[in-house]
Amino acid sequence: MFNRHAVVGAAVGVVRGGRMEFAGHGSADIATHRPITEDTIFRIASISKTFTAIAVMQLWERGLIDLDDPANDHLRAYRLIPDDPAFGPVTIRHLLTHTSGVGETAHPSRVLGPDFGESVAPGAPVPPLSVYYRRGLRVGAEPGTRWTYTNHGFATLGQIVADVTGTALADHLREHVFLPLGMTATSLTPPDQALCRATGYTLRAHGPEAVTHREMITAGAASIYSTPRDMGRYLSALLDGGRNEYGAVLHPDTLTLMFAPQYQPDPRVPGMGFGFFRGSAGGHRVIEHQGILPGFNSQIWLAPDDRLGLMALVTGGRQAMLWLPAETATLMHGLLGVAEPAIRDDVAHHPEIWSEICGYYPMSGSLTDVRARSMVGAGVEVRISGGLPVLRVLTPIPALLRGLRLHPDDPDDPFVFRIDLTRWGLGTGRIVFGHDVGTGGMAMHFDLIPMTLRKSGWLSAARRRRMPR
């Protein structure tokens, strides 16, 4: 992996039978020549969301909340405010599955700032969420109708934990999640052991450059610091029903519920659990999550039925947000002894369905859904080019705008395709078409993330009218 991609430092761990095999690579800090060890402290970024989800499910186990409770029933620090009074309430279930209708950016004017305006400059105090969301957190879509990855939903879950328990989230996680699992070097706030911390880097033309350290305001979504040793203990617990050799944090049935499909826009795609993404590797059920912060990238994989886990923590990896998930997926397939999915040449096209799937699938919602728009731009168009269906992403990236061939992937289902993303280090991706339950129109679902694009009838018709006859 690291022969193909430049990094400053990396830690990889494979967890089996409650034990971790560890490999360190590169440097934790260039200036001091510190190596990467099992006790190097990394920022794990959005993998923090999985810990916040566990804290929420602990409250559910204790009967302090119900998953279908309106979030506002438990929030004391601020309110979730719908853009349309006709919207239903945002529930805790919605927040756990990124289907709350809350957008990716709470303050659109800050979208071009560091971390989309969710962090503070070095030395600046981190404002409480009651101040950060003092005008309320806007809900821009009917809850439950649209999947949008958002830090603000999990920041809100962290606030619910604090408001229900009367304890700061950092203290609650330490006492009820980290310490029971033996994760003694893990914290939500910056650790005191500065000499053990990895420095985040970005790779420039002249070499690695240390990134400016900024603390996240949306703590429950992205603020945790941890070590490979502690993350190994965490994965061990996730693979053994919520317990490891040090203690337990959840009942096994609760963890099973978290890994089950809780949001699944189409039964043919894996969908989302509570705080975890779902997938499949050669018929093996897998659970995963990625983390991204400036200078740091992280990835965890679990194969619960095989009691196999994998984690990777990286500093200074150029475009690691693209290649780290793909490279670790390759490693996970190898550990499971199964082949990675590939483009098939043995499945025939079905031209009779092309008129159904061809057309425009716009990216709906706020322009502040930056991550989604970085993948699909203003949306996608399915068209026939060279006698075969292609998917054009409406983006300035020339290769995506020219189009990606839609390769049939299932001999029993003509609406399932695969696209080749290997030039970006992403392997292949599965695309599923089906009729939307709500509207009856054609919808496009992605396997990589549970995002849905819906075909626009009027845009597609306008395109047909402009075409020469």
Over which residues does each language-model region extend?
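Short, well-ordered beta-strand elements
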Residues: 299-316, 443-447
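Short, conserved catalytic-motif segment at the N-terminal edge
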Residues: 1-44, 64-66, 80, 134-137, ...
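Short, surface-exposed loop or secondary-structure junction motifs
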Residues: 19-22, 29, 83-299
